[in-house]
Amino acid sequence: MALTKAELAEVLFDKYGVSKQDAKVLVEDFFEEIRVALERGEQVKLSGFGNFELRTKNQRPGRNPKTGEEIPISARRVVTFKPGQKFKSRVENAEPED
């Protein structure tokens, strides 16, 4: 099971009493701000949670798994996430729900 944006909006509705529409907008805007900051080349640091960063991966050699032929893997930008210490330890020590 995965936590979705709709479920996050539902939590805001249940916990804080904001309207369902406002909760949906808040969740969408939150993730949009993260995306825009990353597009501008900024790091996103969420205290107690972790850091998002846009990194550039250089071109590198690769191999076609079917033919074994060497092919270049083109340079690209990737989003990385590094969890914070508090977040990491809480998740590592959490008991999974059934």
Swiss-Prot record:
Q: Which SUPFAM superfamilies match?
A: IHF-like DNA-binding proteins
InterPro entries assigned: Hist_DNA-bd, Histone-like_DNA-bd_CS, IHF-like_DNA-bd_dom_sf, IHF_alpha
Domain of life per record: Bacteria
What is the role of the protein in this entry? This protein is one of the two subunits of integration host factor, a specific DNA-binding protein that functions in genetic recombination as well as in transcriptional and translational control.
Q: What is this protein called?
A: Integration host factor subunit alpha
**Gene that this sequence comes from:** ihfA
The protein's matches in NCBIfam families, at most eight in alphabetical order, are given as: himA (TIGR00987), PRK00285.1 (NF001401)
Work out whether the entry's keyword set contains rRNA-binding: no
Coiled-coil segments, which residues? none
Q: Does the keyword DNA-binding apply?
A: yes
CDD domains of this UniProt entry?
IHF_A (cd13835)
Q: How does it assemble?
A: Heterodimer of an alpha and a beta chain.
- List GO BP terms, alphabetically: DNA recombination; positive regulation of metabolic process; regulation of DNA-templated transcription; regulation of translation
Q: Keywords of this protein's UniProt record, alphabetized?
A: DNA recombination, DNA-binding, Transcription, Transcription regulation, Translation regulation
Recorded GO cellular component terms are: cytosol
Q: Which family does it belong to?
A: Belongs to the bacterial histone-like protein family.
* GO MF, one example: DNA binding
